[in-house]
């Protein structure tokens, strides 16, 4: 069965949000493993790859403090604690995929998926906020890499154009 990663991200968001909510409410029984298992259960067949949900949720959960430190400079007007819990967890998931899964998830997919989560579960302006913050992260992280990539592509195009001109020039001299 094919993997449904979008659904997996929804379950991960739901689990992280539930854990945070229950913990802040003083629920000492809040356990991320049992929350994830409970949230996966109704969707296991449609989901396909349950390991994706576990890996994503635990990856974010294990690095929450570090992710929050990395997010803060990208939204300096908004202390992490003042961002809504949904938006905060969407940002964490998005940044985790951008920075820790860049070999598995293309950056634009990570940003788009986070924006879609924000549209579905956040407030009216959440998607714009998420897009802005993760767009800043993308530029900060890949700015120089993108510039190098663009230069390499331009060089390839110029080389191909020169080769084409060279071929055309040699064909004319043969006539």
Annotate the PLM regions.
Residues 1-120, 125-127, 131-175:
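N-terminal interaction/assembly modules
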